């Protein structure tokens, strides 16, 4: 018997860290792409949240494009390679200019250990972008 007043199903989460260049990322037979696409339907609809910690947005043996395009929330820490930033802008199809995106990145990354959070499915459009966890920006 459930010991709490309100019945809440368990929440499942999978953290994938430091796997660039490994068979998990490089081989389709490893099943990562399939898991990421079908994650909402696992466990009879219970689903699983997948958190991927990577040091490169797109690279050889890195995150598959289909996974990148199905991302719900992207935390973008400082990137020094302009090609990577451009790739994020291209694939994200953000509702803002490249110039504004660069301004937002600079604003967020000027603070130590901070990130630009991009929510690709916000319930409120004004909450699409954040500096860190606490500050909404537009």
Predicted regions and their residues:
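Short proline/glycine-enriched turn/loop segments at secondary-structure junctions
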Residues: 104-108
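Conserved P-loop NTPase motor module
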Residues: 111-138
